[in-house]
Amino acid sequence: MLASYYDRDSTPLSQKELNPILSSHERFVACQGGQRAQLARHRLDGLNLANRMLAEADFSGASLVGATFYGSNLERTNLFCADLRYCDLQAVRLTRADMRGASFKGANLSYAVLDGADLRAARMMVMGAQGVTELRRDHGGERDVPSGLSDSVDFSNCSMKNVSFGNAKLDNANFSGAILEGVKFKGAQLTNVQFRGAVLTGIDLGELKVPPEALEGCVLDVTEEALARVGQLQARLAAHEAWIVSAGGGAPAMLDGEDLRPLQGFTAGRRLAGLSACSTIAVGQDFTECRLQAAKFEKADLRAANFSGCDLRGVSFRGANLAHARFTGARMGAIRLADGRMLHAAVSGANATADQFADASLECTLEGLGLE
């Protein structure tokens, strides 16, 4: 788990201590007694707040790194300058919530509703024994925070499939590297918003009304040229499988630089050991149950790809973007080559977190994989 921005200034609570507070808040909302949850500047990292009625609760300045809010109602909730990095916020309702200055870096907000939410830049000032101090985000020591966005709402590297931002205030919001598939921005106020390197698919770009430089490096919808290559790519993968299972038939596939998204539904369960797919675009690609021993995915865009159940011994993900990729049950470690050498799986330089490999079948340590 990543360290919180606010470790030295917040009050920690355990799950056992938190549960009665949440239950009391639910009674309060239902007008059955209880008390509003006042959790400002509390440390709730990694705790379970899923499927709760949390409307109008106060989490301002709270540290909630890695917590789960799956399916909860957070309408009109106060999340002012809260730290929600790597949270599970899928299917939550954040209608008219105060989210100014909050950080959602790396979080999963897929299918969340943020209509009318206030997402403007802000910073929190705290009165203490030594006077007024500023509660600052240090961005985990990162150096690539875009200029002018240090106090902005941070959605960088988030998974935000089918999120609704209807009429939301998004001044200076940072969506760099986020997966914005099917997101609705109708009526939203988008001033000085940053989308650098984001996935913008299934979106009406006209709704964004942003200058071209704000879309630098973005992954957009599949082009007609890429769709026209589907048959050729399928044939090359079929030939690669034949090369694997036969004694001389087929040929190894070299897919470096290709857009593999048109192959969705074709790649799962295949024998693709030794595949070369460096610098490919494979956002959301389904590789489940594939045999990918010694495959090369160096510098590939594999955001939200599914490698569950794969044999990934000896695979190279060096420099790849693995944000929100899944590895449940994937086998990772070294493999012995025909000449007797051992080839180790590697993720050095990749955009990935340790939590993504929590359910993988690791035959080495994360340090052995080169995870930074």
Predicted regions, residues:
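Tandem repeat scaffolds
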Residues: 2-26, 30-372
